[in-house]
Structure formats: C-alpha cells, structure tokens
C-alpha cells in the first residue's frame, strides 16, 4: 500500500493502518539510523523481546520499551517523534507535540482520528 503525504482523507481499515504504521517505522529508522541499524533493531526486537516487525502495531508499548532499552529514553523519544511525524503526515493529520506523550499515545490518537474519518 503506497500512500502519499497527506493523501489519506478516508478511513483506513485496521490492517491498512497497521501497514502504514510499520511503513512509517521502517522509513523513520532508515532515516535516523540507516538500513543496517534498522535491520539490527528488528533482529534484536524479535530475538530478545519476541516482537516481529509485523506485530509492532499490536505491541506498540513493547516496541517502545524495546527502543528505550536499546537506545535510552531520550534517544528513543526522538526516534518515536520521527516515526509519528511521518505517520501523521501519511494520514493527513497535524502533529502537535505533547511533552508527556510517548509513541503509543500518538498512535492511539491517530487511530481515533482515523476511525472518525468517513
């Protein structure tokens, strides 16, 4: 599923939303860390936390904790911000930074806003 920036004006199914989220994670990790480190992150998450890439949308809290363990809280928050900005852009949503929010909070908000689309 290829979506262009700000293209989604319609409600996405949960499966399509999940694919868009994983795509945003892929692109963001590549952008921030590079392809080799992205692959290492996925391998580490799968082998040490039993989180395969395709389960990230359903296990977002565990994914976020895995990033925090791998990189520390502050760097993982920066990575999460890149991911969420990319996801919001793909969904045509406006990103508003909230100091106490983590990646799962933003994704929950995006899911709610997606469900409200017709």
Predicted regions and their residues:
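Long, compositionally biased intrinsically disordered regulatory segments in eukaryotic proteins
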Residues: 1-118
């Amino acid at each position: 599923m290829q979506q262009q920036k700000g293209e989604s004006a319609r409600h996405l199914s949960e499966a399509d939303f999940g694919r868009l989220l994983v795509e945003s994670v892929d692109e963001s990790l590549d952008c921030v860390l590079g392809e080799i480190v992205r692959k290492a992150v996925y391998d580490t998450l799968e082998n040490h936390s039993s989180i395969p890439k395709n389960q990230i949308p359903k296990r977002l809290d565990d994914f976020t904790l895995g990033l925090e363990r791998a990189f520390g809280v502050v760097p993982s928050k920066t990575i999460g911000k890149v991911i969420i900005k990319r996801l919001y852009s793909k969904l045509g949503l406006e990103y508003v930074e909230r100091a106490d929010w983590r990646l799962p909070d933003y994704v929950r908000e995006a899911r709610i806003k997606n469900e409200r689309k017709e």
